[in-house]
Amino acid sequence: MRTLFNLLWLALACSPVHTTLSKSDAKKAASKTLLEKSQFSDKPVQDRGLVVTDLKAESVVLEHRSYCSAKARDRHFAGDVLGYVTPWNSHGYDVTKVFGSKFTQISPVWLQLKRRGREMFEVTGLHDVDQGWMRAVRKHAKGLHIVPRLLFEDWTYDDFRNVLDSEDEIEELSKTVVQVAKNQHFDGFVVEVWNQLLSQKRVGLIHMLTHLAEALHQARLLALLVIPPAITPGTDQLGMFTHKEFEQLAPVLDGFSLMTYDYSTAHQPGPNAPLSWVRACVQVLDPKSKWRSKILLGLNFYGMDYATSKDAREPVVGARYIQTLKDHRPRMVWDSQASEHFFEYKKSRSGRHVVFYPTLKSLQVRLELARELGVGVSIWELGQGLDYFYDLL
């Protein structure tokens, strides 16, 4: 009897089961039919007809990994190119090894500067420093400068007040920073501090940054500064860093990483960096083009996914963007005013979504603008983009 039961069970288990695919299952099955090239190309994207406004989702999925390996070290953009890499998007480390020659500076997001007491400072995050990666990058990209971002972290208003009002404090801060650069074989730093301090201490902050830059220069190191957009997004109001501050710091700093992205908000979905706003931010900073070569126009290699029914948004990096294209096969729309692509899709729970993410065309337009304005570019960040983006640089 038991043998008969086992045979019946085996027959049922092996018999075909006929079911109806749900809509979500059907989409998943359909997504498998979208192809992705895994091999490199012998031509850059500019020569393959891929830099277009009438973009198709299928084309992005098919081509995004297929960069031109033969020209991976050739530069197409003459200005300075700063690229950020982060520990949480490790693909950026690999990108830098392959395309390092296209950059003038690489800024790993490793370090924080903290005040521990009177005339006592510490640079934390050194556990993230990868000397082997630094050696590998420098080996393949001669002349490339590695300038980690140095974030002023956990500073209180009193910390700023005590430091900015004291030459001894500023001197100790500068010594600490220079010594870390020497010990770790850095070429300088990209300092991020401007957004952390209220406007009433700008004079003191300019003095401190000038002193720090002079100390770094004496050690043959570079000093760059992250700055917010000169025009507040969504308004015609000046931002926290204006022409006045730029004129004072431009002679002493080596570059300014201008954050020309994150224009739209969750409550007002839209482009990441409308072209007219990007242009205005540069022109307001330096209307007479005196120091334009030191401005590094910010390019976002990430996008935003807006859930319009919830007034919410989430950052979109390359892998998620490609998966969304596979799952929904949306119609890509070119916003000619902002010079960005976007698309819409629907989710059963969160309803309508709008996604703005950079494309070859939107990046090419911004690189052309940078050439026209005489500025460099800074990219946030290399691990978030698509591999074929780098053909443009």
UniProtKB/Swiss-Prot annotation:
SMART domains: Glyco_18. One of its GO terms (molecular function) is chitin binding. Residues 79-393 form the GH18 domain. Residues 1-19 form the signal peptide. Transmembrane segments: none annotated. It is found in: Secreted; Lysosome. It holds the Pfam family Glyco_hydro_18. Expressed in cells of monocytic, T, B and epithelial origin. The keyword Signal applies. Keywords: Immunity, Innate immunity, Lysosome, Secreted, Signal. GO terms for cellular component: endomembrane system; extracellular exosome; extracellular region; extracellular space; late endosome; lysosomal lumen; lysosome; membrane. The keyword Secreted applies. Changing W277A: No noticeable effect. SUPFAM superfamilies: (Trans)glycosidases. Its main location: secreted. GO terms for biological process: carbohydrate metabolic process; innate immune response; negative regulation of cytokine production involved in inflammatory response. It comes from the Eukaryota. Changing Y302S: Significantly decreased carbohydrate binding. Belongs to the glycosyl hydrolase 18 family. Saccharide- and LPS-binding protein with possible roles in pathogen sensing and endotoxin neutralization. Ligand-binding specificity relates to the length of the oligosaccharides, with preference for chitotetraose (in vitro). Interacts with STAB1. This is Chitinase domain-containing protein 1. It comes from Homo sapiens (Human). The lineage of its organism: Eukaryota, Metazoa, Chordata, Craniata, Vertebrata.
